């Protein structure tokens, strides 16, 4: 397959709109082009993604890569798109199964060695993802924040290789369990007791 579509989320205030990362691998001079109104941190992800893919034991395609971040009119910022871009490249180049990312959304920054680094805005992203009835794959340090939502499937990984093994079903990640939230708090002091 020379085309892949991976789902992720952006951040727009408290909202987390859906972003489609479309990757097309074609013959031609080796290059990587990102279109769809990416800001500087997203454009810089080219080098992080290339190194992370190579250092995780995969091949970086020596072909022409075009990556579209849709919708094009929504600004994309931050490094949270590294993981979905890397997975799109691996699926489009045939290194991961074609439909392995169905019903999943991905978020996370990649280090040069393939480690996943935490990102901000996870609760907003998790709420939007749950609303669309998708599962979420994110960096391990972000798992506790995302698993506060009831009836929501969250998977956490610490390395790109772990994510790929899960998607290839060679070593599946355990679903992060929801943390029960105690809503019965008793406070000795009450603002109603304040006088003056």
Predicted regions and their residues:
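Peripheral, non-AAA+ core regions of ATP-driven protein-machinery
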Residues: 1-196
